[in-house]
């Protein structure tokens, strides 16, 4: 029964010291950026009823949820997503809208073994509820670009897609559900040959504008030239409106000077039943992993109450940390400047001295060793060159110079000792 007591469950790991500090720093910098832009915080439980995620257009497969039972036999899950619980809160609490919210927390998904994906990850994100115009998408993109800039993430791009355009094409060509699922994989993977074969097998007229748009869809990625190409082939007002929305977002972001951080990919299709319009994906070139995902989901909150338009995105904190570790100089823990050793009856004076020295910008620690020699050994092992001893009615400062030598001594007050 103790076979696995020294191991971690599949897809999980321990985070130690510098890496743990970096994760916390990334979360806090994201939080500060979002709060500065007017987002308000929401926290939801780590566990939720399975029913919260059990709706037809859910983006997470049931097999990827960690499930167990509560004391009444009801199915509980570790949350596999942050947006859906947030939608539950908005739908059931009848919050006043429009509303801008931010969150951060761990999510859990049971990925297949050997995929290289972790089953527990940290997400920080934003959601804008109650706004159906393009300003909501623009705000999301600006917020995430500024947050990544403040984190000093290098070489990232935010791709902007539009699932509504693809839905219009599928509807106009009367492609059935099962065929559509196959078609979607061809477009997402940019499998041009398979897409061409699909069109041929369906006997679609290759001169038809909608068919031509479908065939070009995987190739429609880049800058505004992509929009111009798509506009020429858009055969309905709905298609034109979907394309125009992406164009508006791109142009607005570009005018702010953020054009180098964004691109368009009209062949990007994710969670088709979940998202209803513009979608986002962010990448860092060096790691090739998704660091941002999101989009417009106008039908989600209606599963829990009143139908409300919404758009949001999540930042994958673990991937950001991975990128920062590769892009920046190795993180060095700040070395301790001074170690204070004290006799038990001098603890108060040792603490006062520590506080005074820290105000001067020094990194100071109180020794946990029971005698001065052990403190000296600890200091040498950790490259600490100054030790202060608080004993009897005096303070003594030692410095390492081939051996421990007394630098100053005899002061009874930590204030005058520091000033000497």
Curated annotation (Swiss-Prot):
Pfam family, one: tRNA-synt_His
Classification via InterPro entries: aa-tRNA-synth_II, aa-tRNA-synth_II/BPL/LPL, HisRS-like_core, HisRS/HisZ, HisZ
Compartment list: Cytoplasm
Pathway, per record: Amino-acid biosynthesis; L-histidine biosynthesis; L-histidine from 5-phospho-alpha-D-ribose 1-diphosphate: step 1/9
Superkingdom, natural source: Bacteria
Keywords: Amino-acid biosynthesis, Cytoplasm, Histidine biosynthesis
One GO cellular component term noted in the UniProt record for this chain: cytoplasm
BP-aspect Gene Ontology terms: histidyl-tRNA aminoacylation; L-histidine biosynthetic process
GO MF terms, alphabetically ordered: catalytic activity, acting on a protein; histidine-tRNA ligase activity; transferase activity
Disulfide bonds: none
PROSITE patterns listed in its UniProt record: AA_TRNA_LIGASE_II
NCBIfam families in UniProt: hisZ_biosyn_reg, PRK12292.1-6
Family: Belongs to the class-II aminoacyl-tRNA synthetase family. HisZ subfamily.
HAMAP family tied to this protein: HisZ (MF_00125)
PANTHER family: ATP PHOSPHORIBOSYLTRANSFERASE REGULATORY SUBUNIT, HISTIDYL-TRNA SYNTHETASE
Function: Required for the first step of histidine biosynthesis. May allow the feedback regulation of ATP phosphoribosyltransferase activity by histidine.
Subunit architecture: Heteromultimer composed of HisG and HisZ subunits.
Remarks, miscellaneous: This function is generally fulfilled by the C-terminal part of HisG, which is missing in some bacteria such as this one.
Record protein name field: ATP phosphoribosyltransferase regulatory subunit
